[in-house]
Amino acid sequence: MSGDYEDDLCRRALILVSDLCARIRDADTNDRCQEFNELRIRGYPRGPDADISVSLLSVIVTFCGIVLLGVSLFVSWKLCWVPWRDKGGSAVGGGPLRKDLAPGVGLAGLVGGGGHHLGASLGGHPLLGGPHHHAHPAHHPPFAELLEPGGLGGSEPPEPSYLDMDSYPEAAVASVVAAGVKPSQTSPELPSEGGTGSGLLLLPPSGGGLPSAQSHQQVTSLAPTTRYPALPRPLTQQTLTTQADPSSEERPPALPLPLPGGEEKAKLIGQIKPELYQGTGPGGRRTGGGSGEAGAPCGRISFALRYLYGSDQLVVRILQALDLPAKDSNGFSDPYVKIYLLPDRKKKFQTKVHRKTLNPIFNETFQFSVPLAELAQRKLHFSVYDFDRFSRHDLIGQVVLDNLLELAEQPPDRPLWRDILEGGSEKADLGELNFSLCYLPTAGLLTVTIIKASNLKAMDLTGFSDPYVKASLISEGRRLKKRKTSIKKNTLNPTYNEALVFDVAPESVENVGLSIAVVDYDCIGHNEVIGVCRVGPEAADPHGREHWAEMLANPRKPVEHWHQLVEEKTLSSFTKGGKGLSEKENSE
């Protein structure tokens, strides 16, 4: 109330001052009164503006409420009314016929959309002219009144209706046969006489009634028609029935009756062909009669060779591969190819990975620097692998090619084809790491300079990796400190030239060592270790112990070595008898 009272008092004061200013005609006071007029115009009256704001707000709130109400009604209609309508439609004749009808229900079951029973048995079916009539003749007249005088035996038969014969009782089948209607498959009818080429005719099986049909049966007339001409049915092993006698309770088993022209076909039926039961292995190879030894072909590879005499370059173009075996559970492989120019295995090239295919097309070109005089002693080695993101890559097969000079002189438009031979398990090639060690005894500093890595394992689907190097200072199986390099994107031969410095006292240098891991960086998920190498006085690798001893023998001097990367589980421990780092610790 105090706020409203003060506002009202201020408004009255402004009105009073404005009236006084309006009555005073003096020029001196006119300027002073001008500011009161402006103040009144800005602050008073505010009633219409407030009313407009409230009206606009109410309109917005009302509109939003109407929109929300409409959305809620639409969602309710979609969630509640539509499913109930569909459920009701399927129950009232729009859905399939039920098989749980009582034995008294006739062939009609549920007709139209009303869902009313037209007869308690087949004898009262309207199609057969029985005495039963619909409960509402005004709306649904009997089908007997809609038929032409010719009945079922006329020249214009009714459209065939597809019904489920599995639910018919034995009495219903008998009445069907008595009325002159016979069941048949949905395929065209067989003529009653056994013609040539009909193959084999079987008597109906014992047990009475008709054989169970896996699909919907067709009720057609026995009278010949022109609308549905009879076509010869292809030879099958199903039982063909010519007539059904409901009075017989026991029948002999079905026996083959050879017909004219069908003796040879009858002999072929039922014979076992052993060649069809031999297993087919990956790539279409028979596994039943083969020995399965190494060297079996597992696909083919196409490539082209060319030697450049001016630059001493051997150009290799990998074109495609065909009929590779499936290595994954989905029936495909993720193949890629590595090539070496033997006996040098340090320099290698690798194609891109092709996902989910057994016939990859590569079309990639690589060059090897090799003098012409050495080309006769060199061999080209192709290794086809299946890429696996979370485990070791599977070796599909390999091709070793000699006589390179002779093959390189062939026309370039004639590609070479070779069978990919299945080889034994090959040692995992994870790459190599080049780094130097330098120890300063006076300062107590151990400097590890990571220079470069080569031929790293591809960890990404692009055929590359995002590697970085992590060095850990280890003492008695525990990690004391760790240092990391920068990440090099999309490469298998990164160059770092980065120094990692550790504080190591002179009295402790004989009790520590280094674990150096090359890790593939992933933006999503965990980083994966490509390979590790370890150096120190108690390292399991002799090369790692030699490198450490050479560093101690040459203080203040960097000692550089290449180290082969190995898997973490291959090198079970850091020391010869102690506990090493786990793979999880290496990837951190």
UniProtKB/Swiss-Prot annotation:
Residues 183-205 have a biased composition (Low complexity). Residues 1-54 are vesicular. It holds the Pfam family C2. Residues 76-588 are cytoplasmic. Ca(2+) 4 binds at D460, D466, D520, D522. Ca(2+) 3 binds at D388, S391, D394. It comes from the Eukaryota. This is Synaptotagmin-3. It comes from Rattus norvegicus (Rat).
